[in-house]
């Protein structure tokens, strides 16, 4: 009798262990399809919410979206494991930061473009800009180069051949690069729109312009989308254990539905599909 009880107890324990293993396996499968994605509020988080509400469940993906308002935290959070992916940066920014920090990241193809523009609350035409005018540019280096390029493309400044230096400081002090004596100021991206009251013009990234209530038609000048390298991308760790779910998300972000959503959401072309 005792032997029989021992056998039954052992069988029960084995059954319990199998049950717990099965439950654990189910949780693991669910976790593998839950993605925490960091994003800028506009337009990245808006695009991700559309995917979460309309497309993700059909692919068995659950999205949790964390919003960030600066350019440093999303990559740091991805590297530390707090995020499974992020969606906020351009290809040139990705290339520069991953090389500088030795991050083992990967990315998909370009999803969308937010055209950088020159904005003003004092001028109606860029031709009216006077010598010595105050110009605001973003502090973050990669996007700063993009903004300075737009100023150069419009004949306002010249760019040094050696870009591995403090460009704003070099240009501001140089008669060669800044013959009209413009007063260049570096401003944090989210503050650029509100700083327009103290500036003659500012070069503002599309997402910060949108956050500040500006639209492309308000810009004195917009960069051209043709052959533009500054498309925004989904980024993840190369050794992520959730690669299958991440690749599904990246495919959804390149779907006809997302392209149609972008075109409908931003008919003023503040955001352009990149595919």
Role assignments for model-derived ranges:
Residues 18-22:
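C-terminal motif of bacterial Sec signal peptides marking the signal peptidase cleavage site
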Residues 30-42, 61-67, 134-135:
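Short, well-ordered beta-strand elements
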Residues 108-157, 259:
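A conserved helix-loop-strand patch within extracytoplasmic ligand-binding domains
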Residues 42-64, 73:
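Short, polar/charged alpha-helical segment
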Residues 115-126, 230-243:
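A bilobed periplasmic-binding-protein/Venus flytrap-type ligand-binding module shared by bacterial periplasmic
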Residues 143-152, 253-273:
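Periplasmic-binding protein-like
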Residues 65-76, 165-194:
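Short helix-initiation/N-cap motifs at beta->coil->alpha
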Residues 24-26:
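Bacterial signal peptide processing site
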């Amino acid at each position: 009798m005792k032997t029989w009880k021992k056998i039954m107890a052992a069988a029960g324990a084995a059954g319990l262990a199998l049950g717990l293993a099965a439950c654990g396996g189910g949780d693991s499968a669910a976790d593998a399809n839950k993605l925490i994605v960091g994003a800028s509020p506009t337009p990245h988080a808006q695009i991700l919410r559309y995917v979460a509400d309309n497309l993700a469940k059909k692919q068995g993906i659950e999205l949790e979206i964390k919003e960030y308002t600066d350019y440093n935290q999303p990559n740091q959070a991805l590297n530390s494991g707090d995020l499974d992916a992020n969606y906020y940066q351009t290809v040139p920014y990705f290339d520069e930061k991953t090389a500088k920090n030795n991050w083992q990241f990967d990315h998909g193809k370009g999803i969308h473009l937010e055209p950088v523009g020159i904005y003003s609350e004092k001028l109606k035409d860029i031709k009216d800009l006077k010598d010595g005018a105050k110009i605001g540019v973003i502090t973050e280096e990669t996007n700063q180069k993009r903004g300075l390029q737009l100023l150069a493309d419009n004949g306002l400044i010249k760019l040094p051949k050696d870009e591995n230096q403090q460009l704003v400081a070099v240009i501001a002090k140089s008669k060669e690069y800044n013959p009209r004596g413009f007063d260049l100021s570096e401003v944090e991206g989210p503050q650029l729109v509100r700083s327009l009251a103290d500036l003659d013009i500012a070069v503002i990234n599309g997402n910060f312009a949108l956050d500040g209530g500006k639209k492309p038609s308000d810009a004195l000048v917009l960069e051209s989308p043709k052959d533009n390298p500054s498309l925004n991308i989904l980024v993840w760790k190369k050794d992520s254990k959730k690669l299958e779910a991440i690749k599904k998300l990246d495919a959804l972000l390149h779907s006809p539905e997302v392209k149609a959503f972008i075109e409908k959401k931003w008919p003023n072309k503040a955001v352009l599909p990149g595919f």
